[in-house]
Design a protein with these regions (language model features):
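Generic structural signal for hydrophobic core residues of well-folded globular domains
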Residues: 18-22, 37, 60-63, 89, ...
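A cross-kingdom marker for long, charged
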Residues: 121-171
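Extended aliphatic helical segments
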Residues: 9, 30-31, 44-47, 60, ...
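N-terminal Sec/ER secretory leader and immediately downstream segment
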Residues: 1-62
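Structured segments of extracytoplasmic/periplasmic soluble domains
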Residues: 13-20, 112-119, 154
Length: 171
């Protein structure tokens, strides 16, 4: 099997598992997971906008092997954040998402999405429809990072519930 084929089969499966575990991980682990993910995204975008897009949306154009693009320290931090989050999702401080939390997350994210819509106009739709982003890979990567930077600037509890809401819509 080619490395690319293996990446394209396994990455979406890992992502699906992580998204489901994020729903049960404590706030601090959820926020750390997303911070590590965004640190990795920024580093991959320095390699190329196309690599960044493939990293964020492996299902659209095929994924990338981050091990080939990132320094060992960054990969280690990311893998540690992933492992901590997955473990904590089964731990004694396991989180349960409530309807009230989901509703609060919608309110928390509304001003962020409005600010992005004001800045990017119709292109904001690429966040929901990355398959339409051909030729706009840089813009897509920039918008994703700007959105998560704004979310991660929220207090931890709010940031965690927005992250859980956003990834629950990917499941």
């Amino acid at each position: 099997e080619s490395e690319q084929h293996i990446i394209d089969v396994i990455q979406p499966q890992i992502l699906t598992l992580q998204m489901s575990r994020l729903q049960h991980a404590p706030d601090a682990n959820v926020v750390d997971y997303m911070k590590a993910n965004m640190e990795q995204t920024a580093a991959i975008q320095k390699v190329s906008d196309d690599a960044c897009f493939r990293f964020l949306y492996p299902m659209v154009k095929g994924g990338v092997n981050p091990m080939r693009m990132l320094d060992k320290d960054l990969m280690t931090r990311r893998m540690q954040a992933d492992a901590d989050m997955m473990r904590a999702a089964y731990g004694k401080n396991r989180h349960t998402v409530t309807q009230a939390e989901r509703e609060a997350a919608v309110e928390d994210v509304r001003p962020i999405m409005k600010a992005l819509a004001d800045k990017y106009g119709e292109d904001i739709q690429l966040l929901q429809m990355p398959e339409k982003a051909a030729g706009k890979e840089k813009l897509s990567c920039d918008m994703v990072q700007e959105m998560w930077a704004k979310v991660l600037a929220l207090p931890e509890q709010k940031a965690a519930r927005v992250i859980r809401l956003a990834v629950s819509e990917l499941e």
